[in-house]
Structures are given as C-alpha cells and as structure tokens.
C-alpha cells in the first residue's frame, strides 16, 4: 500500500480521492478552505455547465435526471456534496489546511522516486510516495497593466459576481473562453452595451440542436463549422 497526498478538494480532488482509494492506496487530502467544491463555491452567479449533465458527471454517480440539462452552480455544489457523502470521502480531507511546501526526498534515482516531503500550514511535515496537485488554475488573476490608456473600471472574471458589479457600464469583455462568453451573455441580457474582443475568430453555436446537447450528436462532427452553423 502506498501513501499519497492530494492537494485540493474541488471536483478533481474528490475524483482523485475516490480513484486512489479504489486502487488500494492510503490518502491524505488537504483543503485550504472549509468546504469542498473549489471555485464552484465563489464564482459568478451565472456559472453553469457548458457540457450536459449526461457527459459531465463522475463515473458510477450520474446526476439526477430531473436536474436541468446544463446544471447551475448551485446544482453542481450539491452534486459534489452528494458524491462525497456517497463514497465517504470527507474523512480523508483535512480542511482549513494549506500545503505550503513540497519537495522530493533525496535519492540517487529519478526525482520523486524516493517519495516527497510535504509541509502544511499547521507546521506538520509529512512524507508521501506521491503528490497529486488538484488545486485548480483559477485562483491567480492576471490583469495586464496598460498605464495611461484606460481609466475605467476593470473587473477580472475571477472577481465578478453578478450584474451589480458592472451596472450602468459600457462593457468590453476581453477573451472568448468559457468565462468570457458567460460574462458577455450576462451583461447583454441586462441590456448593457456589450462588446467582446478575441485573439482569433470563433464559431459561436447553440448548446443544443433540436433539444439535444451538441456534445451528444457525434454526427455533427462530420460537418464543417460553417455547415454546423447553418444546421444550428
């Protein structure tokens, strides 16, 4: 039996705990907050899945059939809690404890082959056979500094909560990723003058086709983007 450290109790962390336990390993998971679910706890109010519940759920634990096709953030948080309870994952999680330092143990072999030393915010140092990092990639916000050009309000998607943050503003959304598109739609639905800029061209299409999620229609991939636009 090997002993592993998992950093973070968001969706990836929870799935990793179960997978490692199923493989017969001993697990310690450290979560710096007091809740599971990661960024789903504090992201913008309009956050929802962009893939359908049928293809997004954890293996062996489908989402309830009566839920919306593209569940809202609140549904997802409930789902994570149900998943953790169903497989008794919480007892492997230490909350309010951050991992502050990770380094490989000394060895003449490949890095990490002798194990890893992990120090947590409670000052305890532990050793593990491996470390799985599941702390997410949305915590650090990158806002470019362009002095002397724009003096208006700047809001990063990681800080945006709802339309109250930009009420009455003329809105420019930079980027066409998932968050960018969500926020552009949020602003437009509030009747704000909304524009979106992107590095390269994109094809924006409905999430459903005749009531079916596009991700479930394999035959759609046989068509070009232009043909898909016409069909949609």
Q: What is the meaning of each model-derived region?
A:
Residues 43-45, 108-109, 209-213:
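Short low-complexity, flexible loop/linker segments enriched in glycine and/or proline
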Residues 46-62, 110-114, 148, 229-232:
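Flavin (FAD/FMN) cofactor-binding and adjacent substrate-gating region
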Residues 69-139:
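Feature captures the FAD/FMN-dependent oxidoreductase FAD-binding
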Residues 1-4:
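Extreme N-terminal starter segment of soluble prokaryotic enzymes
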Residues 6-12, 16-36, 124-126, 131-232:
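Rossmann-like dinucleotide-binding core of oxidoreductases
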Residues 57, 95, 101, 154-157, ...:
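Structural signal for conserved beta-strand scaffold positions within catalytic alpha/beta enzyme cores
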Residues 6-90, 198-207:
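Beta1-alpha1 glycine-rich phosphate/pyrophosphate-binding loop at the start
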């Amino acid at each position: 039996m090997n002993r592993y450290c998992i950093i973070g109790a968001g969706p990836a962390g929870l799935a990793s705990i179960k997978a490692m336990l199923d493989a017969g390993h001993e697990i310690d998971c450290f979560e710096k907050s007091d809740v599971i679910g990661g960024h789903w706890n504090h992201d913008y109010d309009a956050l929802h899945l962009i893939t359908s519940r049928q293809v997004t759920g954890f293996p062996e634990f489908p989402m309830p059939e009566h839920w919306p096709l593209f569940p809202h953030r609140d549904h997802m948080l409930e789902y994570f809690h149900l998943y953790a309870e169903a497989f008794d994952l919480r007892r492997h999680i230490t909350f309010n404890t951050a991992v502050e330092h990770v380094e490989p143990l000394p060895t003449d072999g490949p890095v990490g082959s002798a194990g890893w030393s992990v120090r947590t915010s409670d000052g305890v140092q532990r050793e593990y056979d491996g470390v799985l990092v599941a702390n997410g990639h949305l915590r650090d916000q990158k806002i470019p500094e362009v002095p002397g050009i724009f003096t208006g309000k700047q809001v990063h998607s990681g800080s945006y909560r709802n339309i109250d943050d930009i009420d009455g503003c003329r809105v420019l959304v930079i980027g066409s990723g998932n968050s960018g598109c969500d926020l552009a739609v949020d602003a437009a639905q509030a009747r704000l003058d909304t524009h979106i800029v992107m590095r390269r061209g994109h094809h924006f299409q409905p999430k459903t086709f005749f009531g079916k999620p596009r991700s479930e229609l394999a035959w759609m991939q046989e068509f070009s983007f232009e043909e898909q636009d016409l069909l949609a």
